[in-house]
């Protein structure tokens, strides 16, 4: 995972971000420096509890002396580095990336911040055509169990789910990228149905998905019936009681019923990752 060094660092580096001097510990990334400077740098494939994979290119910034834009989520800071996060070149790149993504998949259930970024950068995905024309996108949702749904019409191939299923959390490797080019997609081994795969239903893939391609079955059903209302939900933090690890749970409650369970990514015990019991073992608590 990409972690900023803690404790007393051996070396502090000083760089300039949008004209402001920022001091960060050696080993920090440009994104760390941007956030320390209070800048809202968009990210899609990055998460604080996952290893950067550099695929979305939304977080790119301009570094003085570099011919190409660089991904801030993984580029380590160097002493004296001069970074521009809001230049015309950066804004154009981010606008185009967001347009291409939003024109290729359905984004109506994506995280709210994605819509905010699109408005901020003036993205107009409609000028790219209808996303339903893409063969790999126009596919029905995979409802294969009672826990969660895979709706790949909304998948942007950020690979967060693959990372969470693999080295960064669960080490199950039940899913991976299959195919190439326009045929690339997330798949189980040999494209078997999820209950027949190596999946252990920890749900960590759901916890990191930014576009709603992976959702709780409860949320999916409530959206179909028009009863899902995120604004009306109350979130209560508690501690999972199934074992002695002490994982923190955020219970999302609507109409006095638990509709889904998440975990804070910045919690020191599990970094937001849970097992099947913590993520889905709450049906007994329903009124």
Residue ranges and their predicted role:
Residues 1-14:
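Terminal leader/tail segments of proteins
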Residues 13, 20-79, 93:
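N-terminal cofactor/phosphate-binding cores enriched in small/glycine residues
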Residues 57-58, 66-198, 206-207, 212-239, ...:
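Fe-S ferredoxin-like electron-transfer domains
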Residues 59, 158, 202, 243, ...:
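Short Cys/His-rich metal-coordination motifs, predominantly Zn2+-binding knuckles/fingers
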Residues 195, 199-202, 270-274:
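Short beta-strand-alpha-helix junction that forms the catalytic/metal-binding core
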Residues 232, 236-264:
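Catalytic and ligand-binding motifs that coordinate phosphates/metal ions
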Residues 252-287:
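Cofactor-/ligand-binding subdomain signature composed of acidic, glycine-rich
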């Amino acid at each position: 995972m990409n972690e900023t060094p803690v404790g007393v660092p051996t070396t502090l580096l000083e760089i300039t971000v949008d004209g402001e001097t920022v001091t960060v510990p050696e080993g920090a990334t440009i994104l760390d420096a941007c956030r320390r400077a209070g800048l809202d740098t968009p990210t899609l494939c990055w998460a604080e509890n996952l290893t950067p994979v550099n695929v979305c290119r939304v977080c790119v910034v301009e570094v003085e002396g570099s011919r190409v834009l660089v991904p801030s989520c993984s580029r380590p800071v160097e002493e004296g580095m001069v970074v521009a996060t809001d230049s015309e070149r950066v804004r154009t790149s981010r606008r185009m990336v967001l347009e291409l993504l939003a024109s290729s998949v359905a984004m109506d259930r994506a995280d709210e911040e994605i819509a905010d970024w699109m408005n901020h950068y003036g993205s107009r995905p409609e000028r790219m055509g209808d996303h339903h024309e893409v063969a790999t996108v126009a596919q029905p949702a995979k409802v294969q169990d009672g826990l969660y749904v895979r709706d790949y019409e909304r998948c942007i191939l950020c690979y967060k789910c693959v990372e969470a299923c693999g080295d960064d959390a669960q080490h199950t490797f039940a899913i991976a990228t299959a195919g190439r080019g326009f045929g690339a997609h997330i798949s189980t081994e040999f494209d078997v149905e999820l209950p027949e795969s190596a999946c252990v239903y920890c749900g960590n893939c759901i916890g990191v998905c930014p576009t709603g391609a992976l959702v709780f079955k409860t949320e999916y059903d409530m959206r179909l019936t028009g009863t899902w209302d995120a604004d009306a939900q109350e979130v209560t933090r508690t501690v999972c009681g199934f074992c002695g690890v002490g994982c923190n749970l955020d219970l999302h409650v609507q109409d006095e019923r638990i509709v889904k369970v998440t975990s804070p990514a910045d919690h020191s015990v599990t970094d937001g990752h849970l097992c099947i019991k913590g993520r889905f073992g709450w049906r007994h608590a329903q009124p």
